[in-house]
Amino acid sequence: MSGIGKIALVTGAGSGVGRAATLALLREGYTVVLAGRRQDAMEETIGMAGNDAARTLAVSTDVTQPAAVDALFQMIRDKYGRLDVLFNNAGGNVPSTNFGDMTFEQWRHVVDVNLNGCFLVANAAFRMMRSQTPQGGRIINNGSISAHTPRPGSAAYTATKHAITGMTKSIALDGRAFDIACGQIDIGNAATPMTARMARGVPQPDGTMKVEPTMDADNVGKTIVYMAGLGADANALFVVVKASKMPFEGRG
């Protein structure tokens, strides 16, 4: 198991792909710090880990608040002394809304969580990885296939995910001098509470509604383990993992 003795942090670890990634990293031997708003949801994730639960720490964290992120990393520093892997996963969305009907409050909410929160956590991880001995680590940002091709009515979400792509490239570039690698996983239709609506049908670019296939979220966990376990001389800069038959290529 490549993760033995290594410390990983997963944000948004209480459900969905964050939960899948947490459990996969634990199975690989990592010690995992879970961060999220809901302590009860994170404890539920830990309850699924069996004997691996002994290698977990759950920290209630609002990633949009700088003080909360600082407190999270101080706790990691105090308890473990270092951080080897970050899965920067926390995110959210608003209901599908035509761009002309979107309010600034909706826009700001998505930007605060998906972009500002991602920055705050990645920035704190970068600083910790730069200062620790041995130096370095790996940051994995959760992008989306919306970082490539938008859905109808998803301007805020799509804009933030395109921005994450730019931030991933910048972190990867700036991190070279400190042995900090940064990659991005772009996920399409993992079966989670966030994608439950796919079974009821979602708007398509041609104006129709279509039921879309999903994939087991465990596929995301396996991909995170692969990305996290690469040698320091390699980086999976961008990885797309999606339901095989979902509309994506041309959104058709």
What are these regions (language model features)?
Residues 97-99, 106-111:
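Substrate-binding pocket helix/loop in short-chain dehydrogenase/reductase
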Residues 144:
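Residue(s) in the substrate-gating loop at a strand-loop-helix junction
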Residues 184-185, 204-249:
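C-terminal helical subdomain
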Residues 14-16:
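Conserved glycine-rich cofactor-binding loop
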Residues 122, 160:
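Active-site helix of classical SDR
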